[in-house]
Amino acid sequence: MLVMNLQLFAHKKGVGSSKNGRDSEAKRLGVKCSDGQFVLAGNILVRQRGTKIHPGLNVGRGGDDTLFAKIDGVVKYERLGRDKKKASVYPVEVEKVVAE
């Protein structure tokens, strides 16, 4: 009497699953207006997490620590002591040109 022992084997390799392969979207943080640049009121100067740069004269701080200009003027980045920085906006006197 012939007894056959049939065993079925996998014909595809078992593939493990990886727990990697995803990343968060970049937040586009950083300085948006450089030193000496003319800005309008409401322009964003710096997008940041925490106060890496502190608000100075005529600069406001948003709820997410974004710094923005309160008036039209020129941006100036200054040092506060050894390890702190501040951003200020100074008004610019505009000369009127009279057509002759």
From Swiss-Prot:
Domain of life from the UniProt record: Bacteria
Xref: PROSITE patterns: RIBOSOMAL_L27
One of the record's GO cellular component terms: cytosolic large ribosomal subunit
Propeptide feature ranges: 1-9
UniProt GO molecular function: structural constituent of ribosome
Keyword terms, alphabetized: Ribonucleoprotein, Ribosomal protein
Record PTM: The N-terminus is cleaved by ribosomal processing cysteine protease Prp.
GO biological process entries: translation
Family: Belongs to the bacterial ribosomal protein bL27 family.
Protein known as: Large ribosomal subunit protein bL27
Annotated organism of origin: Clostridium botulinum (strain 657 / Type Ba4)
Gene: rpmA
